[in-house]
Every structure is written in C-alpha cells, then in structure tokens.
Amino acid sequence: LFRSHQYSEWRQSYFLNVRNPGALPVPFTAKLRSSGIVVNPAIRNSTTGEHIGFDTTLNKGDVLEIYRTTTDRLAVKLISGGVETNAFALLDEDSDLMELHPGDNVLTADAASGREGLQASISFYPLAVGILPEVMK
C-alpha cells in the first residue's frame, strides 16, 4: 500500500494555521517575499500574541529570511537585488523569539503598509519526545 506525503501547501489567506504535530515547541524558518513596497513587515502568532517584526522597507522582489542557526541562534538575512546581507539589526526591539507550539499556530504576515504585497512561507521539523538508548547507559 502506497501512502503519499505532503511536502508543501500553498494558500492565499490573511491567516495561516500552521499545525505542529510534534510534542515540543520547534523553531521554524520563515521567508517574507515582497511583490511591492512593504513597510515594517512582521509575522504574528495570533494564538500566543508573539511576533517577529522588522524596522525596514522591502522593495519589490526583496526576501527576508528568518531562521535559527545550527547553534540555535536567531538569524535574519535580506536578499535584495540578488545580494544577500545580514539583516539581524533590522529586527524590531520588541520582537519575540518565536517557536511553533504543539498544535495549532495561527500566523499572519503583517506590515505597517503594503501588507497585500507580502507573501510568507513557513517550514519546520516537528519533534517527538523520547529517550535515546545511549542516554540510558
């Protein structure tokens, strides 16, 4: 019996329910793409009230990528005109170190202006709780 796997899903909506099927909160990668002028873009979790915001203006074609490094530090890069730069300094000082909590996370891509030109994509790996055999030795 063959079972298919869902690798991605595209929806046009102001609210996006991202379901974390795992047992633990997990970091995620978000890409904010601009199809026009977008002022102070942000991602908001309507369930928890947390947000990650930026004090910047995105131009058409710009991409902000928010992710965690291999040492679990928050990182941000801006790709503008084909040039990639470190954009950590653009973070709004009131931003939260957001994770996707187990269950439903209702996220929105928001902006002070130009929100209709902002497109967000979210990716993550769910985590399960367990004990590794080598830990029990």
Locate each region found by the language model.
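Intrinsically disordered, low-complexity segments enriched in serine, threonine, and glycine
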Residues: 2-137
